[in-house]
Amino acid sequence: MIFDRVPKKYTVESGGQIQACGTSGFLHEVIRPSTPSKEVSITLPDTILCEIRLFSKGQLPDTVQDWEAPYNDCDMLLLPTHADDEHIFFGGIMPYYAGEKGMKVQVAYLTNHWGEPYRPHELLNGLWEVGIRAYPVISEFSDYYSEALEHAKTLYDTEKMLAYEVELIRRFKPEVVVDHDINGEYGHGVHMLNTWLLQQAVEQSGNAQYFPESAQKYGTFDVQKTYLHLYPENELIMDVDTPLKAFGGKTAYEVAVAGFSKHVSQQKWFSVEKSGKYDCRKFGLYRTTVGLDSGIGDFFENVTFSDAPDPLPPKEESTQETASDIQTESSDTVSKTESTLSFWYLIPIVLGGAVLLCCII
């Protein structure tokens, strides 16, 4: 199911069993009814449902976004400022490390695009295309344009933003963090702000005196390696031209371009480049606790992994009592829709406490 906004809690009833859903905060969500049935009733209070697709038992197509929860402990944390930055400036990192090598790459955005409802969908579509499977973190900070760092600082509560970045590091415990060019890529003040904040966050995340609330919740953590796009010192040039088996022989660059193509609204302004001023291959090691790179082009060179393999998050489950509590909050209005298996249909309506009944024939 694809929602217009992150849904409130809702229920799915199948074979007399009621599941509580909508607790993950996913905009695109796969629900597996607890009991096989030819009739499924979905109760959606005050929610806009854009698309729903039904499948028979078996493996889902690769194009279906069956998101996992954000990692408990990731290998790499990417910190793009806006939706699409992760492809334009970080290029082949996600296709290679997440898609090809199967490493735990967590993406967390400094700003959100809830004021442009189509962009969060583009964000998810792009990430899925390049091999990201852990749901991204999207901050509460709105997107504003700025042409200078000092101006950008006036647009936000920078202490609150710094707390956010410190908490991300402590929560996800990445061995490697990647962020923007210090000069804001093309001069965007909020890109500059993002990196200015990270430069402080990597120094503070290991000290419990800074932001003690997140230190108490997640513990402290010191990142081993911090890379910045286009940073001129300790340069790393990423190989984005080697064919990747996970993507049928496409290169990391080609996959990055395909990921950015999902950001339909941004195509006339930007592109993914592997040369020139905004070369997506070029990074520099800004901070390290494990020594300098040798030049082999691997972000994880010299890194020591201390975490155990991350278990797959459990599929959404809840007790029938909790589900019933949610269902009680909604009205008895019923909208019945019939569909054959694997059939797409669009529901551009606000379901204010409505019940969607899917009859499978």
Question: Would you name each region that the model predicts?
Answer:
Residues 3-9, 16-211:
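Active-site beta-strand->loop->alpha-helix modules in alpha/beta enzyme cores, enriched
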Residues 5-16, 22-33, 67-68, 204-332, ...:
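The feature marks non-catalytic terminal segments
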Residues 95, 139, 214, 238-240, ...:
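Generic alpha-helix signal with a bias toward terminal, lower-confidence helices
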Residues 96-100, 147, 241, 246, ...:
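Residue-level signature of transmembrane alpha-helix interfaces in integral membrane proteins
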Residues 335-343:
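Short, Lys/Arg-rich cytosolic juxtamembrane segment immediately N-terminal
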Residues 351-361:
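C-terminal membrane-anchoring or membrane-association module
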